[in-house]
Structure formats: C-alpha cells, structure tokens
C-alpha cells in the first residue's frame, strides 16, 4: 500500500473544514460513489443525488501513474475545473484538484473536492477514512435473463453483440424506476435502509431540494433510456443488414437452416429488447410527468400556504397596530386629563398667590397706617427712635423728650408732671421688624435718622446748655426765645432752641428762625430762657 522503505503513500485529501483523507493503495482500483459496492461511499448532505452510485474510478496505469475515470456519472467529474469525458482515463499528478459533481445552489464550490497528495502514512493515519468492507474492486450484480435470451446467447457463439449487456441496462432502469416510484409514493419504514433505493440521509435536506434532485435523476434516466433505444435500433438495423447480406450470398456464407434460426432468434430477442426499452422509456416519461405534476402541486400548495401565512401575519400585524393605536389614544386622553388637572391646579395656585400678595399688600398698608398713626413721635413726627414711655403712659423718642424736659417737666400731650422715664424695647423691636418689611427707601431713611440722632446726642454732650432766669441779661451772639405756655395743639412753637446756625434748628424741629412768630418771643417775668 505504501512505498517500501520510504513510507510514502498516495491519497486524496478533502478540501474544506473536514480534511479527511482517502488512501489510494498501490496496484488496486478505488471506486467512489454513494452506492454500496464501492471502495469509499460518499453521502452528500446538501443534494442527496449529486453523487452517482459508482461515480468515478481511480487506478494506476502501466507507468504507475494514478488516473481517474468518469463512470458516466450524472453530474460529472472535474479535473482542475475541467469536466472529464465519460469512460476515459485522465492522468493525475501531485496537487491535482478533483471535483465530484457541481456546486449546489448559492454555493461557490462543490461538496466533494479532493487534492491528490503524496505523504507519509504515519502523518495521515489519523485522518484516514476506512473503505467499505468487502472487495476493493466493485463487482457487478449477476442477473438472470429470460430463457429465450439465454438460449439465443448460448447458441449464437462468438458475436460482436452482447445481449446480457442490454438486459442489464433495461433491468437497471426498471429497478430504478420502481425504487423511485416506491420511495415517492410510500413512506420509509423506520429502521430499514433499502439498498436499491438511495441509501443517503435526507434529514438535513429540504423537501424542495429533494424533489429537484429526484426530477433531475429521473430526467437523466429518461435520456439514458433514449440513448439505449437509439443504440438498439442501430444494432438491429446492422444485424438485419448483415443477415440480409448472408441471405443474398448463401454460397459464401454457407448458412444452414440452424444458423438461419439462430439469426432469427437473435433478431427476435433484439426486437423484444427494443420493445422493453420503449415500454420502460414510456413508463419513465410517465413517471417524470407525474413527478413534475406533483412538484407543481406541491409548489402551488406551498405557495398557497405561504400566502395564507402572510395573510395571517398581516392580520396579526393589523391587530397589533390597532391595539397599539387604541393604547396610544388612551394614553393621550390620560395625558390630556393630567394636563388639564395641572393647568387647573396651576390656575388655583396662581389665584391663591395673587390673594396672598393682595393680603400681604394689605398687611403692609395696615402696618404703614399703624406706624404713621400709632408709632410716631408727636414731637419730631417720625417713628420712635429709642422709644421712652413716661409715667403717664405716653411714648416719645428718647432724644425728643430729653430736649423737651430741658424746658418743661410736663408731658407734651397731657401736661402731667413727668416723674419717670422707661425705655420701651417692645416698641423698638416692633418698629424695627415692621420697617424691615417696608421698602428699601424707608429702611434707608430710618437708618439715616438714627445716625443723625446719634450725632446730635454726641454734639450736645460736647456743648453743654445753660439756663438763665434773668430776662435783662443778654449774652453776645445769643437769641432769647420765650417759652410761654400754650395749648398742647401748638407744641411745635412751645419749645425752640435758637442758635446762630439755622441748619441746626431746621434739623431738629423742621423749621428756621424766620418761621417763628413774634408772639413766641413775648414772655412774662416768670418765664425762663434757654441760652445756647
């Protein structure tokens, strides 16, 4: 099997992912196909009938070169992408690409592609494929012929025409047609693998591909039968011509009555064979028509099923679309209701806010009224600054009442004698908190007044005041202002402090010396004067 000493051997390495190796033993014939009587059985998965029963033959020639022969396969044998003629040996060399069959639809390469290589046996032993058990060379199945054909062949002797060959061809076609018809009309029995029918696994092949392969195979058989019929017609004509020539020259041929009967039987056998071939051809054509009709029916039913499936999918899609639109409408209505509720709530909030603002404005106005009417000093007409409450419960600014008491010791409002002064923190805090809620202008004005009062207090502390009771004594650069008693309604003219600088008087009482009435300077002898 391998070269002696070197350990080299010839083998076929399969192309593709499954790199299996087929060993080519030296001096032996190697057959490949999908049948049982071959060396290596090939089982196509994409197209079950792509490989014939005995597809090709590998053997060595006289120069120990390997050759490949196409055994008239249906889809042919290809050497380096060139198809080989049937029954003709082609020499192979190392690296030659052998392709069995044609590429299936939607594929670029065939399922079975091999490269002839010469490698060590130990190197490829792990990938070797074992041949089928039995003889390496395929043996033909012996068939029993009819008695007439047997007698004719036995009595004829040596002849250029072999009747058993045509009988074998016709029986093969008949068996193939029967097996195809049986496999097409009857389901396969579980656990049984028929030998005459296609012994391949078709679980992974779609029904459409199986039907296509069957129709292709049946068409090829019809063509083979037609070729055999033509061949039989030609041979019958040749036989008749030879027989006619022998009958026309009886002396040369020296035919006796027995020889004439033999020739007649031979012609009759050929005619019977021809009629059988014609019947088988008609039967094959009929079966082919049935297969085509079944294919059309299956395609029509498949198309109808696909249309129904598409209609169901369309109806389901429309139903889902309707449900989706209904759900969207419900969501839209819900969103509109939510938006309306939010708008209503926003409007209510806005109205409440406006009410609160109005109430706040009303409260501020009321606070201003309270500040102007109740928390205002009657002497300076300003809000209390460091409020002081007298024993008579009347309140004044601390600075204002101190300035008043320098002239009189009685309340400017009720004329009750002043006995005590009490600082009122409650009024100060209340006024401060109320002023904080007023406008910034009011806040700044009050802060300026407080600062001014502090400066005035500091100025008085630095410049003391003298009280002179003698009305005839005068000091230079001073004014004498009468402090006559008058009604409480004219408090603005009861107490005046006159200085040379009129700005000081205006800041304190809000008026200048020009506004004083002449009656304010008239005084009795008991009146006292303030000298600044």
UniProtKB/Swiss-Prot annotation:
Entry's EC annotation: 2.3.2.27
Region Disordered: start-end pairs: 127-209
Enzyme class: transferase
Biased composition (Basic and acidic residues): 169-178
Keywords assigned: Chromatin regulator, DNA damage, DNA repair, Metal-binding, Nucleus, Transferase, Ubl conjugation pathway, Zinc, Zinc-finger
HAMAP family assigned: RNF8 (MF_03067)
Subunit structure: Homodimer. Forms a E2-E3 ubiquitin ligase complex composed of the rnf8 homodimer and a E2 heterodimer of ube2n and ube2v2.
Protein name in the entry: E3 ubiquitin-protein ligase rnf8-B
Organism: Xenopus laevis
């Amino acid at each position: 099997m391998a070269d002696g000493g070197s350990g080299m051997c010839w083998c076929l390495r399969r192309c593709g992912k499954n790199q299996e190796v087929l060993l080519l033993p030296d001096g032996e014939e190697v057959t490949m196909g999908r049948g049982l009587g071959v060396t290596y059985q090939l089982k196509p998965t994409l197209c079950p009938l792509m490989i014939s029963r005995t597809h090709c033959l590998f053997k060595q020639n006289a120069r120990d070169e390997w050759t490949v022969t196409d055994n008239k396969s249906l889809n042919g044998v290809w050497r380096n992408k060139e198809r080989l003629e049937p029954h003709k040996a082609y020499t192979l060399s190392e690296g030659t690409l052998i392709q069995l069959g044609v590429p299936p639809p939607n594929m670029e390469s065939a399922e079975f592609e091999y490269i002839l290589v010469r490698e060590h046996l130990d190197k490829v032993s792990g990938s070797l494929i074992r041949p089928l058990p039995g003889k390496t060379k395929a043996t033909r199945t012996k068939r029993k012929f009819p008695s007439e054909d047997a007698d004719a062949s036995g009595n004829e002797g040596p002849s250029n025409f072999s009747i058993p060959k045509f009988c074998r061809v016709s029986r093969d076609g008949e068996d193939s047609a029967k097996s195809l018809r049986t496999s097409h009309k009857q389901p396969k029995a579980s656990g049984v693998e028929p030998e005459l029918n296609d012994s391949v696994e078709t679980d992974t092949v779609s029904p459409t591909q199986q039907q296509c392969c069957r129709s292709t195979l049946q068409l090829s058989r019809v063509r083979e039968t037609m070729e055999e019929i033509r061949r039989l017609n030609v041979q019958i004509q040749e036989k008749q011509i030879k027989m006619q020539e022998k009958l026309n020259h009886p002396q040369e041929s020296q035919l006796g009555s027995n020889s004439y009967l033999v020739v007649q039987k031979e012609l009759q056998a050929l005619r019977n064979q021809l009629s059988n071939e014609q019947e088988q051809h008609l039967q094959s054509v009929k079966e082919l028509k049935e297969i085509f009709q079944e294919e059309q029916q299956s395609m029509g039913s498949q198309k109808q099923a696909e249309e129904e499936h598409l209609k169901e999918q369309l109806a389901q899609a429309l139903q889902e679309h309707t449900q989706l639109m209904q759900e969207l409408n419900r969501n839209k209505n819900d969103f509109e209701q939510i938006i309306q509720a939010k708008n209503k709530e926003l409007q209510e909030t806005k109205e409440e806010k406006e009410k609160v603002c109005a109430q706040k404005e009303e409260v501020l106005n009321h606070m201003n009224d309270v500040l102007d009417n109740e928390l205002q000093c009657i002497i300076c007409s300003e809000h209390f600054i460091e409020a002081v409450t007298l024993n008579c419960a009347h309140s004044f600014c601390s600075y204002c009442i101190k300035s008043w008491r320098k002239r009189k010791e009685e309340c400017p409002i009720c004329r009750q004698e002043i006995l005590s002064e009490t600082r009122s923190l409650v009024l100060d805090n209340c006024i401060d908190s109320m002023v904080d809620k007023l406008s910034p202008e009011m806040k700044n004005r009050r802060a300026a007044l407080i600062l001014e009062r502090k400066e005035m207090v500091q100025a008085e502390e630095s410049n003391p005041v003298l009280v002179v009771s003698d009305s005839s004594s005068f000091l230079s650069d001073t004014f004498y202002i009468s402090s006559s008693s008058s009604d409480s309604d004219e408090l603005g003219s009861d107490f005046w402090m006159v200085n040379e600088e009129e700005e000081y008087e205006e800041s304190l009482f809000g008026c200048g010396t020009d506004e004083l009435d002449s009656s304010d300077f008239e005084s009795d002898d008991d009146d006292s004067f303030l000298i600044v």
